Amino acid sequence: MIEVRFHGRGGQGAVTAANILAEAAFLEGKYVQAFPFFGVERRGAPVTAFTRIDNKPIRIKTQIYEPDVVVVLDPSLLDAVDVTAGLKDEGIVIVNTEKSKEEVLEKLKKKPKKLAIVDATTIALEILGLPITNTAILGAVAKATGLVKIESIEEAIKDTFSGELGEKNARAAREAYEKTEVFEL
């Protein structure tokens, strides 16, 4: 089983990202689970969402405390939250940032096995006209993890958002997929 934990802020679409990743894996014939964790969150407050993917039915129903993959939608969270808490030794961290690999690693409390960075904010602004990075960051997830194909991400996005909005969001994911830098550490 692969467990993915998303870190974002209220209103950024972390929950939607977790759901779209689950749908993309489902489209590939996998068993999935996606769910948010809500405390007293409000717009702008830190939010956590989770996705589990497996080749067999998933029976566990808890939050994800030891993720295989951590996805950070808002780079300011690197200063506010220990996003690597519980990260497995072979873990992957994916960060939306314009900063360098070295700058990101300085902020992580635990060094991942693999780090992926992409400026999903700029991609979202250019394509969507809004700094909502949830669909763009899924392109980085596809590239860095190989969990799902980018085509499955695009299809799941178009299932979630209809018409031109779906097309633009799928394009944002594809562009992020192409621009993501992946570093083996």
Curated annotation (Swiss-Prot):
Enzyme Commission number(s) of this protein: 1.2.7.1, 1.2.7.7
Record GO terms (molecular function): 3-methyl-2-oxobutanoate dehydrogenase (ferredoxin) activity; pyruvate synthase activity
Cited InterPro entries: Oxidoreductase_gamma_subunit, PorC_KorC, Pyrv/ketoisovalerate_OxRed_cat, Pyrv_flavodox_OxRed_cen
Record bears the keyword Isomerase: no
Keywords: Oxidoreductase
Disulfide bonds: none
Name of the protein in its database record: Pyruvate/ketoisovalerate oxidoreductases common subunit gamma
Subunit structure, interactors included: Heterotetramer of one alpha, one beta, one delta and one gamma chain.
Catalytic reactions of this protein: 2 oxidized [2Fe-2S]-[ferredoxin] + pyruvate + CoA = 2 reduced [2Fe-2S]-[ferredoxin] + acetyl-CoA + CO2 + H(+); 3-methyl-2-oxobutanoate + 2 oxidized [2Fe-2S]-[ferredoxin] + CoA = 2-methylpropanoyl-CoA + 2 reduced [2Fe-2S]-[ferredoxin] + CO2 + H(+)
Organism: Pyrococcus furiosus (strain ATCC 43587 / DSM 3638 / JCM 8422 / Vc1)
Gene3D superfamilies from the UniProt entry: Pyruvate-ferredoxin oxidoreductase, PFOR, domain III
Signal peptide range in chain numbering: none
Lineage top rank: taxon: Archaea
UniProt xrefs under Pfam families: POR
NCBIfam families in the record: PorC_KorC (TIGR02175), PRK08534.1 (NF006321), PRK14029.1 (NF010632)
